[in-house]
UniProtKB/Swiss-Prot annotation:
The record marks 433-434 as: Cleavage (when cotranslationally processed). It comes from Canis lupus familiaris (Dog). This is Nuclear factor NF-kappa-B p105 subunit. The modification Phosphothreonine is found at residue 947. Generation of the NF-kappa-B p50 (Nuclear factor NF-kappa-B p50 subunit) transcription factor takes place both cotranslationally and post-translationally via non-mutually exclusive mechanisms. A cotranslational processing allows the production of both p50 and p105 (Nuclear factor NF-kappa-B p105 subunit) from a single NFKB1 mRNA. While translation occurs, the particular unfolded structure after the GRR repeat region acts as a substrate for the proteasome, promoting degradation of the C-terminus. A motif (Nuclear localization signal) lies at residues 360-365. Pfam families: Ank (PF00023), Ank_2 (PF12796), Death (PF00531), RHD_dimer (PF16179), RHD_DNA_bind (PF00554). The modification S-nitrosocysteine is found at residue 61. One of its GO terms (molecular function) is DNA-binding transcription factor activity.
Length: 972
């Protein structure tokens, strides 16, 4: 046979096989499709593999499956099934099929094969004597319940040993000597039974019930006709249970967004086919022109996977955040265990919009040129002559009336100037007040006067033709002449009225100019134009908006003063096209003085921008603690403290997301609800701090804000669930020390509801939820949740060696203590403690008779360095204290001449210049370590107790303050 020759030709290239070893059946080294021949003898080959996915394992109570296990090439109209062939042999034979595991080492599986020719979980089929191809058309897989895995596996192993069905490979290597016997089943010794029991016990713990493989073994007859000659077995591809999360085909069904900013961090809701929450990734990738691949992964935790069908994640940062045009990439699901991926979907990264509030764009707008105010010749037919020149051109786009030139801002105007109608009754939302349409009263009064175009039109109408003169009656001529006379008179009246008003306006402005020349006070000029402050430009900005955008604080103050009592309430709260009030812009542009001026002038604190943000939200987002402090003093601030924006976030949530410790402390002190839930998923500020892995803010919320440590989201998730799912040992330790319960169940089922079949008819109640212990991703977190003390990565000796505070002399320390005891709040020990990250201990320091000394002692034993101390003093502007430290290092060298030269030599203290510090460094100093908790974990500060010398971080609160009963004191 030609096809047999192919296999025979391969024999010379194959090594001679010893008895089966685990290495041969390592799935990474062994390909099931390849025949495993013996030297010049018969061997078994798989002709068609079973279909890997789409076949469901069924429980006993579900009944038999509909149709057998299909083959890999099976189609809807062309069914196929697994097939094997005994090569190089013709005659009677027996083929058995067993279910084995998919691990690195092959073992018997607890599931059973059912169907035709199947008994006790094993399928036995005879082959030959002519056709050596064997098909398995009716195979089904019976899913064993979790409770019966050990019992079933032990029985299956016992049968394999008694019948000699590969016991050395599938049960234990020590049982390899057991072979098939012609006389029937053999009896097992007690030692063999114990080996089987221990093997079953061990393999039960490691068995994956969602995947199996078929192992085919052929037996040929011996001289007595008994089937004892075993050929080397072959193993199929893995077969995955279709209802198992890690077996289904990955598929993205829907995303609520398909584009995002290059900076990442944008939240996307993704619907998908069944996934396993701890075995799934969201991969973004781009194939580069040079053949390389960029990839990034969405940020989410197991708590963000809802019922295996939805994932809420944040986009990763793109490789280049400075792109100028959109970049197209792909997004796909990827399973961690086998790296299988879904079909990729397109995703677009667009350039960062750095000026979302459009402040920079408006600042870059061309400034008006002073020379544009001179020469009315640019108007529609206007001549020259200067501002009050006699150029006789008519009023056009560049002039007012017969010759007054004013800069044009694009308003609907008389000659470029806009008069706001009814300024004493103006609407704060009104834009572009115009008077280019005559009112109803004007059109009906004064003898039914009409405009100049009407006069010109009527003038044309009243010129009769010769034919009209001949045919017209005398009465018509009189009437027509009378009408024309009336209209001409009205036209002259309107012209005179307009000129009179224009002259009055000019006199007012001239008098204001004289007053300004005498006093030098610009308010003299602004006072006569205060009614125009309600006019808005093409962006909806008033003069007050523009003055704030261009950082003219004094002009803002002048405008507020001249409009006081007239239309101030309308103008000061007027919104532009972005729904920004002047107060919003003052916060965005970080102008503390302007914010204060606007509030004093009556600005409304409660107005929201287009995204629903109040000024409290904006100040917290920008990390402007000084502005936030001003705002919180307002009487309406209390009503806005817990008001959500369009994203459902309160100001305290935004302060946490912006990593602003000063803003968080201000909000907590002002009475903000630290347990308030954001509107999307019910997360509190503590949840957000844990999500951002910010131990400093989490500690502040617990210690300063008395946050409820076991607060839950809409799906019952606590902060400890998030910390455990993300594998954060430090946050898990902090929350556990604060009394968090590791046994709280959320609403996510611990196992798939479809697994209710496993109960085999037994009612075991509802499916339990998932606890933090269930979600622990590493052993460190698991041990902490079980009460094991937190162990840092470094020992105390290593960390203490980093400090050099001992180099300071006692005299220098005494001088520092004295300087830090002054009452100045900007230069005392309390401010220094905040800068050094020990601010959380200030209340304890105050109990000490010498707070400054206690602070410095704590800083020294926590491994503090002189460099950090000097930098903190530099931020405070405390030059006297810095000079004390410098003198302490210079004095010894000045007294002792350098050997060999005899000249004094000064030590250069490694002080970092404030000018070289980046804003990021300042944020880190002021925010990350400000609560003291971060310092405790980072330095393992073995602080001597202020009263008894106990450990440095002890969370001592009443049980009810953490929402727990019983003792909750924890030490880290």
């Amino acid at each position: 046979m030609a096809e047999d020759d192919t296999y025979l030709g391969a024999h010379e290239q194959m090594f001679h096989l010893d008895p089966l070893t685990h290495t041969i059946f390592n799935p990474e080294l062994f390909q099931p499709e390849m025949p495993l021949p013996t030297a010049d003898g018969p061997y078994l080959q798989i002709l068609e593999q079973p279909k890997q996915r789409g076949f469901r394992f069924r429980y006993v109570c579900e009944g038999p499956s509909h149709g057998g296990l299909p083959g890999a090439s099976s189609e809807k109209n062309k069914k196929s099934y697994p097939q094997v062939k005994i090569c190089n042999y013709v005659g009677p034979a027996k083929v058995i099929v067993q279910l084995v595991t998919n691990g690195k080492n092959i073992h018997l599986h607890a599931h059973s094969l059912v169907g035709k020719h199947c008994e006790d979980g094993i399928c036995t089929v005879t082959a030959g004597p002519k056709d050596m191809v064997v098909g398995f058309a009716n195979l089904g897989i019976l899913h064993v319940t979790k409770k019966k895995v050990f019992e079933t596996l032990e029985a299956r192993m016992t049968e394999a040993c008694t019948k000699g069905y590969n016991p050395g490979l599938l049960v234990h290597p020590d049982l390899a000597y057991l072979q098939a016997e012609g006389g029937g089943d053999r009896q097992l010794t007690d030692r063999e039974k114990e080996i089987i029991r221990q093997a079953a016990l061990q393999q039960t713990k490691e068995m994956d019930l969602s995947v199996v493989r078929l192992m085919f073994t052929a037996f040929l007859p011996d001289s007595t006709g008994s089937f004892t000659r075993r050929l080397e077995p072959v193993v199929s591809d893995a077969i995955y249970d279709s209802k198992a999360p890690n077996a289904s085909n990955l598929k993205i069904v829907r995303m609520d967004r398909t584009a995002g900013c290059v900076t990442g961090g944008e939240e996307i809701y993704l619907l998908c086919d069944k996934v396993q929450k701890d075995d799934i990734q969201i991969r973004f990738y781009e194939e580069e022109e040079n053949g390389g691949i960029w990839e990034g992964f969405g940020d989410f935790s197991p708590t963000d996977v809802h019922r295996q069908f939805a994932i809420v994640f944040k986009t990763p940062k793109y490789k280049d955040v400075n792109i100028t045009k959109p970049a197209s990439v792909f997004v796909q699901l990827r399973r961690k265990s086998d790296l299988e991926t879904s079909e990729p979907k397109p995703f677009l990264y667009y350039p960062e919009i750095k000026d979302k509030e459009e402040v920079q764009r408006k600042r870059q707008k061309l400034m008006p040129n002073f020379s544009d105010s001179f020469g009315g010749g640019s108007g529609a037919g206007a001549g020259g002559g200067g501002m009050f020149g006699s150029g006789g051109g008519g009023g056009g786009a560049g002039s007012t009336g017969p010759g007054y030139g004013f800069p044009h801002y694009g308003f609907p105007t008389y000659g470029g100037i806009t008069f706001h109608p009814g300024t004493t009754k103006s609407n704060a939302g009104m834009k572009h007040g115009t008077i280019d349409t005559p009112s109803k009263n004007d059109s009906e009064g004064c003898g039914k006067n009409v405009d100049r175009e009407a006069v010109n039109l009527s003038g044309k109408v009243t010129e009769p033709t010769e034919q009209d003169k001949e045919s017209s009656m005398g009465v018509d001529e009189v009437t027509l002449t009378y009408t024309v006379g009336i209209k001409e008179e009205n036209s002259r009246f309107q012209d005179n009225l307009f000129l009179e008003k224009a002259m009055q306006l000019a006199k007012r402005h001239a008098n204001a100019l004289f007053d300004y020349a005498v006093t030098g006070d610009v308010k003299m000029l602004l006072a006569v134009q205060r009614h125009l402050t309600a006019v808005q430009d093409e962006n909806g900005d008033s003069v007050l908006h523009l003055a704030i955008i261009h950082l003219h604080a004094q002009l803002v103050r002048d405008l507020l003063e001249v409009t006081s009592g007239l239309i101030s309430d309308d103008i000061i709260n007027m919104r532009n096209d972005l729904y920004q009030t002047p107060l919003h812009l003052a916060v965005i542009t970080k102008q503390e003085a302007v914010v204060d001026d606007l509030l004093r002038a009556g600005a409304d604190l409660s107005l929201l921008d287009r995204l629903g943000n109040s000024v409290l939200h904006l100040a917290a987002k920008e990390g402007q603690d000084k502005i936030l402090s001003i705002l919180l003093k307002h009487k309406k601030a209390a009503l806005l403290m817990d008001h959500p924006n369009g994203e459902g976030l309160n100001a305290i949530h935004i302060a946490v997301m912006s990593n602003s410790m000063p803003c968080l402390l201000l909000l907590v002190a002002a009475g903000a609800d630290v347990n308030a839930q954001e509107r999307k998923s019910g997360r509190t500020a503590l949840h957000l701090a844990v999500e951002h892995d910010n131990i400093s803010l989490a500690g502040c919320l617990l210690l300063e804000g008395d946050a409820h440590v076991d607060s839950t989201t809409y799906d019952g998730t606590t902060p400890l669930h998030i910390a455990a799912g993300r594998g954060s040992t430090r946050l898990a330790a902090l929350l556990k020390a604060a009394g968090a319960d590791p046994l709280v169940e959320n609403f996510e089922p611990l196992y798939d509801l479809d697994d209710s079949w496993e109960k085999d008819g037994e009612d075991e109640g509802v499916v339990p939820g998932t606890t933090p212990l269930d979600m622990a991703t590493n052993w460190q977190v698991f041990d902490i949740l079980n009460g094991k003390p937190y162990e840092p990565e470094f020992t105390s000796d290593d960390l203490l060696a980093q400090g050099d505070m001992k180099q300071l002399t006692e005299d220098a320390k005494l001088q520092l203590y004295k300087l830090l005891e002054i009452p100045d709040p900007d230069k005392n020990w309390a401010t220094l403690a905040q800068k050094l990250g020990l601010g959380i201990l200030n209340n304890a320091f105050r109990l000490s008779p010498a707070p400054s000394k206690t602070l410095m002692d704590n800083y020294e034993v926590s491994g503090g360095t002189i460099k950090e101390l000097v930098e903190a003093l530099r931020q405070m502007g405390y030059t006297e204290a810095i000079e004390v430290i410098q003198a302490a290092f210079c004095a010894p060298e000045t007294a002792a001449p350098s050997p060999g030269k005899g000249a004094p030599q000064t030590l250069s203290l490694p002080l970092s210049s404030a000018s070289t510090r980046s804003p990021v460094d300042e944020v880190r100093d002021d925010s990350i370590c400000d609560s003291g908790v971060e310092t405790s974990f980072r330095k393992l500060s073995f602080t001597e107790s202020l009263t008894s010398g106990s450990s440095l971080l002890t969370l001592n609160k009443a049980p009810h303050e953490y929402g727990q009963e019983g003792p909750i004191e924890g030490k880290i």
